Amino acid sequence: EILHRLVGSEMCIRDSRIGRKNSVLLGVSIYWLGCFICLFSNSYMIFVLGRFIQGFGIGGPRVVSQAICRDLFSGNRLASINSFIMSIFILVPIVAPLLGQGILFFFYWKYIIVFFILFSLITTCFLLLNVEETLQEKKRISFLAIVKHFKEVLSNLTSMIYIACLGLLLGGLLTFINICQPLYFNYFDVGSRFPLYFALIASMLGLSSYLNSRYVGQFGAVKLAKIFSLLLMIWTSINLLYQINYFSFNLAWFSIFIMISFSFFGFIFGNLNALAINPFGHIAGYASSVIGALSTFIALVVSGSASTFFDGTPIVVIFTLSVCSISTFFLLFTQKLFEKK
């Protein structure tokens, strides 16, 4: 994930200089190189190298796509687009395992790599043929200007608050992802049913992201982010206090707790991301990269620290989500005070 973000940052430096579509093509070309290495690998280490290069290449198009959205949209419309994209993106952990199993049922495992190549080829051709270049040549910037814009992002207090909130909530999400498999396998003993539980949880995040894309234009990104951060704080705090007093975990309760928490996330993530990047329409590509890198760094610090305290029970997840939601609520509702200072 760190490499993915660093490559995204580097790609957006090039993106700001060579254009959006050229940057996507460069990143996808590196991804294809990784695919072919995997396809013709004859050892595990070569296969891992190929996967490494795949991640290296795909980091750029991911961030550039966010920049394209910011080039075309702003404000609540941008938040709506981001939420819709997330609702589709969240379907990946639900559909991908089933798709992979289907390919393996009929073909050899290397056909999964063939599918990667064909799918990326189709999507890249669609982008190149149907999406016009959104960064005109006269707006492309030099390396020295990029350094200046980096300082511009860091000095924007409003965006930095939204970035901090994104990082905290993403940290809570990554904490769950890091320990959910041993938790469900060892503590709840779900065995082969784990993918089903994970799919149900992910579907709640995807559904709420889709609903947010429908209603953000009506209520506004700021209002929705604040309302659902408040609800998330109340929900996680109540459950944390209950578990501190009773320390009684069961599968149904924990799954419901996570599903409701993730449904609140769907109304927050897309809006915060749109609010963070909104002031930087003139440097959308690079700003998107910086926002992604900073929020991921915060998230990795949070999830890495929290995961070290994992004791085999769900308490670490509940505690981390509660602390992160309280911190996010505090930052969002005291934002004006920080800005005045």
Residue ranges and their predicted role:
Residues 132-163:
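Juxtamembrane intracellular "pre-TM" segments in multi-pass secondary transporters
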